[in-house]
C-alpha cells in the first residue's frame, strides 16, 4: 500500500502494510468456502486415503519400469509423485506425455536448490493425483511412461 502524493507520485508505506492489496477477491473467498464445505462433506480422511492409494499405485507402477528413478523421500508421502527417466530430460517426458493427453509439471533444481544440491537431483517430473482421479488415469500414466522408456533403447 502507498499514499498517493500527487498526479505522478506516491510514497510507499514503511511497514508491512505496503504489501497489502486494497481490493478483495470476494468470488475467490466464496469459492474457497464452497470448496471447504464440499471437502468436509466428502470427508477429509476419505480424501487423504484416496490420494494415498492413488499415489501408492503410481509409485508402484512407475517403480517397476526400467529406467525410472522415483525421487520421493520421507516416511509420509503426498499425492505428488516425483521421478526421472534415465537418458530423457524431464521436459522431454512432459512433452511426450502431452501426446497421451497427460499433464505433468517439471521441477528444476533451482526450485528446491538445497535439496537438489544435497541429493544431486536433475530436473524431475511431478505427477500429481487427487481424490477425483481414477485408477484408469493413473494406469494410463504408467503405461505411457513404460512406452516412453521402451523407446530409449
Roles of regions detected by a PLM:
Residues 1-153:
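Pyridoxal 5′-phosphate
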